[in-house]
């Protein structure tokens, strides 16, 4: 295999890369006599690297922000960090990341923070682009509540953006990173030029003085990104972006509801004094104009939620019902009356159609995108340097970890299909007739997908249609088999509010070779499990990253761009080359099916295996009968 030496520029850039801090495996907070065990790497930004920390006495988990003292040489750097801690340490709000402690040793400064395992809205944006209006209401309302709390304490955040809005396991928004935050009196105006280009307010760029209003401008940008998938003033150059901001040059897509458009316009008003304050935004009609979930399931991080027709329709017309008295951030599906179909205008129907187009995936579920990304990586001259493997830890990208992957599978395709378990313990079956069935972790929500992609949702507490009973029996058999033979016993999971919104990724296509099993999920990820050493490889076209899971369940994630720039070690390179061949095969099969049927072919199929001559029996005689309430 031909290997190419890195260019001088690349070697230079590698040397410039900040080395990770020297962090001991056990960290001592001497003042509190507390010991923390260093866990997995969480990410980096600025001078800091973040690790999961476990209190050795209590077992509690924290996010540990570590800054080497060697990088805090100048007084202004030390002052900036002291101010960040001083502002953040006393904040107590459900929508603000909690800062617990601040301490140091001879080498590093440590800050222990509330752990947010579901990363940030930035990762959600990369996977989903535009989200539904109910989701936008859910996230934006929490952001505004957190900002209202800060403003009541005379704190201006000044760097609100997707990457600083973190998510816990319940997908609650937590405002974090107070590195640019400042305190401000009502009539005071700050002159510092600070912020992030796509979110920065015009008064900051024009240096006329700024205050609390910059946070409301940023919320307008965030709401716009959530709804339409890109920043309102984004361009190919920083100069052009700033020009658009100064001239208030942006366009609201016609798919937006009237309430969303109006809120965006007032938040992005170029005159700061005309923007509403955070309290007024909390009362805005947008949050009452349609369905707002009380809670969102984790599947929303990667899949469009399951919303019924009424909930989509509510986005576009004034609701005939009202938010219940629990407050808009707590209102569930029962909080709004259904809108009669005859009240939805033709224009609303067009808006709904346009918006649904924005959520629709390509028919190949991103296979062609992934193939292009892998081709680009393999076409890049690979750095053949002695320390390429040693340097891997410094450019891991844990923020790009997959949300879902297949943890277990069992092949009964000679008669029925393939059963599998996702990493959240939900269980599914891809039948030989290309239909799919999925049962969530709690065992309460059932999804059935016809080979035509029509979806049906059922509550397990209600009657399942008689036509589905045979497939339900098979699902239970697969689930029982995996529980008895493959899975470790997990804790009992109870049903939660919002579980009915979940749309879990399902297995679309799979095949086996002599070396591996190849699995393609409906959220775009391709997973390859190697038989000889039990390594799993998960490639994600949306995060443009690859994750390796070893036999000890340790996960290592790298962005394709980082592997291209810093060098791809031999142990990864040959697997990625193998993945390219497998993805190429998936793409070719999709193209063949699409041509054959002369229509979008997102149907789930098993490709012929290269390692066996298993006969695939048809299950076409299983034709379920659906109740009239079945939903797409």
From Swiss-Prot:
GO terms for cellular component: centrosome; cytoplasm; kinetochore; nucleus; spindle pole. Disruption phenotype: Mutants are viable and fertile but about 30-percent of the progeny die at the embryonic stage. Surviving adults are mostly male. Impaired chromosome pairing and synapsis during meiotic prophase. Asymmetric disassembly of the synaptonemal complex fails at the diplotene stage. Partial mis-segregation of chromosomes. Increased germline apoptosis. Simultaneous knockdown of plk-1 and plk-2 causes a loss in pie-1 polarization in the 1-cell embryo, an increased association with the oocyte pronuclei and a decrease in pie-1 degradation in embryonic somatic cells. SUPFAM superfamilies: Polo-box domain, Protein kinase-like (PK-like). InterPro entries: Kinase-like_dom_sf, POLO_box_1, POLO_box_2, POLO_box_dom, POLO_box_dom_sf, Prot_kinase_dom, Protein_kinase_ATP_BS, Ser/Thr_kinase_AS. One of its GO terms (molecular function) is protein serine kinase activity. One of its GO terms (biological process) is regulation of meiosis I. Residues 405-484, 506-588 form the POLO box domain. Residues 36-287 form the Protein kinase domain. The keyword Metal-binding does not apply. SMART domains: S_TKc. Expressed in oocytes. Residues 1-26, 313-334 are annotated as: Disordered. Keywords: ATP-binding, Centromere, Chromosome, Cytoplasm, Cytoskeleton, Kinase, Kinetochore, Meiosis, Nucleotide-binding, Nucleus, Repeat, Serine/threonine-protein kinase, Transferase. It catalyses: L-seryl-[protein] + ATP = O-phospho-L-seryl-[protein] + ADP + H(+); L-threonyl-[protein] + ATP = O-phospho-L-threonyl-[protein] + ADP + H(+). Gene3D superfamilies: Phosphorylase Kinase, domain 1, POLO box domain, Transferase(Phosphotransferase) domain 1. The active site is at residue 159. Belongs to the protein kinase superfamily. Ser/Thr protein kinase family. CDC5/Polo subfamily. Serine/threonine-protein kinase which plays a role, during oogenesis, in chromosome pairing and synapsis, by facilitating the recruitment and attachment of meiotic chromosomes to the nuclear envelope during prophase. Promotes the localization of brc-1 to the short arm of homologous chromosomes during meiotic prophase I. Regulates the formation of sun-1 patches along the nuclear envelope. Promotes meiotic nuclei apoptosis in response to chromosomal asynapsis. Interacts (via POLO box domain) with mex-5 and mex-6. Interacts (via POLO box domain) with him-8 (via N-terminus); the interaction mediates plk-2 recruitment to the pairing region of X chromosomes during meiosis. Interacts with sun-1. May interact with nicotinic acetylcholine receptor. This is Serine/threonine-protein kinase plk-2. The gene is plk-2.
């Amino acid at each position: 295999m031909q290997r190419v030496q890195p260019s001088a520029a690349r070697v230079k850039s590698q040397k410039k890369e900040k080395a990770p801090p020297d962090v001991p495996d056990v960290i001592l907070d001497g003042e509190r006599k507390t010991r923390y065990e260093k866990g997995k790497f969480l990410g980096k930004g600025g001078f800091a690297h973040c690790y999961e920390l476990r209190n050795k006495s209590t077992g509690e988990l924290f996010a540990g922000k570590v800054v080497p003292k060697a990088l805090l040489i100048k007084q202004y750097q030390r002052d900036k960090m002291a101010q960040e801690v001083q502002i953040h340490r006393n904040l107590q709000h459900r929508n603000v990341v909690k800062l617990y402690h601040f301490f140091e040793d001879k080498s590093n400064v440590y800050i222990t923070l509330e752990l947010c395992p579901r990363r940030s809205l930035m990762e959600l944006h990369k996977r989903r682009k535009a989200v539904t209006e109910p989701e936008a209401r859910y996230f934006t309302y929490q952001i505004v509540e957190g900002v209202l709390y800060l403003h009541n304490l005379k704190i201006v955040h000044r760097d609100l953006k997707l990457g600083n809005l973190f998510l816990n396991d319940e997908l609650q928004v937590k405002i974090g990173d107070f590195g640019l935050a400042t305190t401000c009196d009502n009539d005071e105006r700050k002159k510092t030029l600070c912020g992030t280009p796509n979110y920065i307010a015009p008064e900051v760029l024009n240096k006329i003085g700024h205050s609390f209003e910059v946070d409301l401008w940023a919320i307008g940008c965030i709401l716009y990104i959530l709804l339409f998938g890109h920043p309102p003033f984004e361009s190919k150059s920083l100069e052009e972006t700033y020009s658009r901001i100064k001239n208030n040059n942006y366009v609201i897509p016609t798919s937006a509801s009237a309430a969303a458009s109006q809120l965006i316009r007032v938040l992005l008003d170029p005159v700061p004094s005309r923007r509403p304050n955070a309290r007024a935004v909390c009362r805005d009609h947008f949050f009452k104009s349609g369905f707002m979930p009380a809670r969102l399931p984790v599947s929303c991080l990667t899949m469009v939620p399951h919303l019924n027709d009424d909930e989509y329709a509510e986005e576009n017309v004034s609701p005939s019902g009202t938010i219940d008295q629990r407050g808009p951030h707590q209102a569930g599906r029962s909080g709004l009356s259904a809108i009669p179909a005859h009240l939805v205008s033709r224009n609303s129907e067009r808006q709904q159609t346009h918006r649904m187009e924005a959520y629709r995936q390509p028919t190949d579920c991103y296979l062609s995108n992934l193939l292009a990304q892998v081709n680009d990586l393999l076409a890049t001259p690979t750095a053949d340097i002695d320390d390429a493997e040693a340097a891997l830890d410094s450019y891991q990208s844990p923020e790009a970890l997959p949300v879902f992957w297949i943890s277990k599978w069992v092949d009964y395709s000679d008669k029925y299909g393939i059963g599998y378990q996702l990493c959240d313990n939900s269980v599914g079956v891809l039948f030989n007739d290309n239909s799919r069935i999925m049962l969530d972790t709690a065992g309460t929500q059932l999804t059935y997908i016809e080979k035509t992609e029509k979806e049906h949702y059922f509550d397990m507490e209600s009657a399942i249609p008689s036509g589905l009973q045979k497939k339900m029996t098979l699902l239970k058999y697969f689930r029982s088999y995996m529980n008895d033979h493959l899975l470790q016993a997990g804790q009992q999971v109870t049903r939660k509010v919002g579980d009915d919104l979940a749309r879990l990724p399902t297995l679309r296509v799979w095949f086996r070779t002599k070396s591996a099993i190849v699995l393609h999920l409906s959220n775009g990820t391709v997973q390859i499990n190697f038989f000889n050493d039990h390594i799993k490889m998960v490639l994600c076209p949306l995060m443009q990253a690859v994750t390796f899971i070893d036999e000890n369940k340790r996960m290592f994630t790298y962005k394709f761009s980082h592997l291209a720039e810093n060098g791809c070690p031999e142990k990864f390179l040959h697997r990625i080359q193998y993945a390219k061949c497998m993805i190429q095969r998936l793409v070719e099969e999709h193209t063949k099916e699409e041509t054959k049927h002369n229509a979008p072919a997102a149907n789930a199929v098993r490709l012929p295996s290269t390692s066996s001559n298993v006969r695939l029996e048809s299950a076409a005689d299983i034709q379920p009968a659906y109740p009239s309430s079945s939903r797409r």
